[in-house]
Every structure is written in structure tokens, then in C-alpha cells.
Amino acid sequence: MAKVTREEVEHIANLARLQITEDETTEMQNTLESILNFANQIDTADTSEIEPTYHVLDLQNVLREDKAIEGIPQELALKNAKVTEDGQFKVPSIMNEEDA
């Protein structure tokens, strides 16, 4: 059984820059002990007959197959553009010439 001291709780609170009351220190002490005991339970669980996994759920790739498809015609893509040049969208520059 894990035992957390008041000094450890106060040190953790200090590291987190928290000011906690005596009641909060006691509550946090009990909470941390509970968490550490649960972690110890998990650590000591017999998993010798359990197959290792990388994911909790047995998921397969659910994405569709990647297939090239015909895009929209250039004229249609540029139809509502305010300014075009050489078959491309023309937008205001966001960099100075010196930045390029």
C-alpha cells in the first residue's frame, strides 16, 4: 500500500504553485494514495496469457482506397475568382520582396 506524506503533498503543491489548505492537503493525500494503489494493482496484474496489443480496440483502416479521380475543370474553379493570371488565382502578396 502506497503511503503519501503531508510533506510530499505540500511539495507537489509548491511545484504546481498551488496554495492549499490543511483540509485540501489531507484530501489530496488520500487521493494520491488511492491513485498510487490503483497503479500498483495494474502493475502487479498477471498479463502473461494476454496477447500484446498496440491499440485497445481491434480497429482496421477505415479509410477508403485512395483512387485518383477527375477534378473540376480549371475554368469552373476560376469562374468566381476576382483576379486570375495565367490560369491561376491571383491573391495579394503577404510578404515583402526582401522576405522572399
From Swiss-Prot:
Gene3D superfamilies in UniProt: Glu-tRNAGln amidotransferase C subunit, N-terminal domain
InterPro entries on file: Asp/Glu-ADT_sf_sub_c, GatC
Taxonomy, superkingdom: Bacteria
GO molecular function terms attached to this record: asparaginyl-tRNA synthase (glutamine-hydrolyzing) activity; ATP binding; glutaminyl-tRNA synthase (glutamine-hydrolyzing) activity
Enzyme Commission number, as recorded: 6.3.5.-
Gene Ontology biological process terms in this record: glutaminyl-tRNAGln biosynthesis via transamidation; regulation of translational fidelity; translation
Family to which this protein belongs: Belongs to the GatC family.
Name this polypeptide is given: Aspartyl/glutamyl-tRNA(Asn/Gln) amidotransferase subunit C
Function: Allows the formation of correctly charged Asn-tRNA(Asn) or Gln-tRNA(Gln) through the transamidation of misacylated Asp-tRNA(Asn) or Glu-tRNA(Gln) in organisms which lack either or both of asparaginyl-tRNA or glutaminyl-tRNA synthetases. The reaction takes place in the presence of glutamine and ATP through an activated phospho-Asp-tRNA(Asn) or phospho-Glu-tRNA(Gln).
EC top class named in words: ligase
Substrates-to-products reaction catalysed: L-glutamyl-tRNA(Gln) + L-glutamine + ATP + H2O = L-glutaminyl-tRNA(Gln) + L-glutamate + ADP + phosphate + H(+); L-aspartyl-tRNA(Asn) + L-glutamine + ATP + H2O = L-asparaginyl-tRNA(Asn) + L-glutamate + ADP + phosphate + 2 H(+)
Summary of subunit composition and partner proteins: Heterotrimer of A, B and C subunits.
PANTHER family: GLUTAMYL-TRNA(GLN) AMIDOTRANSFERASE SUBUNIT C, MITOCHONDRIAL
Keywords: ATP-binding, Ligase, Nucleotide-binding, Protein biosynthesis
